[in-house]
Amino acid sequence: LRVFLGYVQLEGGGRVSTIPMDGGECSIRSGFGPGTPFFGDASEDLKVALQRLDFGAGGDADLSTVLEEARGRDGLTLWHLLSRTSGEQRARVYDRLASLKPPPATVTRQGVLALDATMLDRWWDDMRPF
């Protein structure tokens, strides 16, 4: 799915993906919920690793690739990965996202790692447009 105007929100399999305009994309596979959104101009390495994380046997090496390849605009992808990871992986995602798109003062690391919906929404609103 590619979005050229507005936003599209996909839900399924316990996942929610919000895909913005200006090149936002999201893979969809039968038997899974929507994949993690990304921008079409992201690196091929990031996109391949993300596909493995979403639909295959992806692991720490794939997450490391996504984190290393992420640019500021890829905050979209990293923000979605917060709710799709746990423990140390979520902490790594938070740290990389915070380095690219610092959270507002009202958003704490502890709150985000606990998936506090209010804090996640504040950060989402603060980082747009991507």
Language-model segment annotations:
Residues 85-130:
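Long, helix-rich interaction regions
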Residues 1-61:
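Short, polar/charged, low-complexity connector loops/linkers at domain or secondary-structure junctions
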Residues 54, 67-71, 82-83, 98:
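Ankyrin-repeat helical core positions
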Residues 73-79, 105-110:
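Amphipathic alpha-helical scaffolding segments comprising HEAT/armadillo-like alpha-solenoid repeats
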Residues 5-7, 75, 79, 94:
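Extracytoplasmic/secreted envelope proteins and their assembly/folding machinery
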Residues 62-67, 74, 93:
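Conserved hydrophobic register position within alpha-solenoid helical repeats
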Residues 13-16, 66-67, 104-109:
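Flexible loop/turn segments at the boundaries of HEAT repeats in alpha-solenoid HEAT proteins
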